[in-house]
Amino acid sequence: MKHIIPDYTFPADPHEAVESDFAALDALYAGRKAYYGDFHAHSNSGGTSDGHTAPEEWLKAMKELHMDFIGLMDHRQVRHMYLDSFDPEYFLYGTEPAGLWNDPQLDCHYLMIFQERGALERVLQAFPAEFEFEGGVEGHFKYIRMDRSRFDAIRDAVLREGGAFVNAHPMQQIKSDDLRDFDFGPGTALETIYACAYPEQLNPHTIENYRLWLDMLASGRKMINTSTADDHGAPTNAGVNTVYSAEKNGPAYVRQLIKGDLNAGFVGIKMCMDEHPVGSTAAYREGMTLQVKVDDVHPLLFDPAEKWRVDIHTDEGLAYSAPLKQHFAAAIPVKRRKFYWAEVIRERDGAPAAIGNPIWLE
């Protein structure tokens, strides 16, 4: 069984499939549809933006690429969110600052993604020493070195505003061997699939970030994973995530990100543990069942001629694996483990079509 990380082996933790009516899973996903999009891209919005594609050109390209949303995370400014072409049905509010820490002396990039436009400015204004935000639609802010405690305070402010806080391209930016330097705290996420400068998910950057995420899970950290192409050039769909939402608009996708109820990649993974959704924590009890379905695939990125498989993992290893077939469904008994999660893998080379997020147990 090939896997994206060539030297990584999942120990066996076998679970036998059980019969299920999938009523709990179907109830959780009732009224929700699969939407595809990238939380992290850049546009040519003027000012200090460094993307090559104007927002109005992004809107046209998204239809051709079968993308439902894009997070325009243009640097050092807020003006992109005020353009007439910024449509909140398709674009997400936010920006990508740099975190420059004093102790340890490390640099990171992170995303602040919001459900409403004014939240970003409120956070910037709440930290004058850290951003020196000039205010107003044309106001810019700076990347200023700060203590890690102030960075954590910014994170807390973002979360209080109902925003998402994401560690962007972590292994490509943070030069450290200490997991604590990659851990932005409870309620945050990190990018695993990183297709920047690559046409698809199987690339050295994804391998590095995916291994980091596995190490963080193994260390007991609750960390959500996402996918991105961090697109600065011609529009691409190489970094899409799959989000099941009852609404088709930016704030709804951000709410699912905050919950951790989504998966990286272009194949949708539906999963629950009894009534508990992806991204949640459940109290273990005897007789629980994990239910998984794979019904939705991106029409341009998924190749039905390839062979794919669905793997279900626990903290102790590979619990279940089966070929991906149309309308895939599997149920396994829940054992006393720390978490369960699922992924979809291309058989010939181990490339991930989807990396799901966990359901944790306590």
Predicted regions, residues:
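Catalytic-core region of carbohydrate-active enzymes that cleave or remodel glycosidic bonds
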Residues: D181-F184, T188-G250
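A metal-dependent hydrolase metal-coordination microenvironment
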Residues: I4-A168, D177, G185, I193-A195, ...
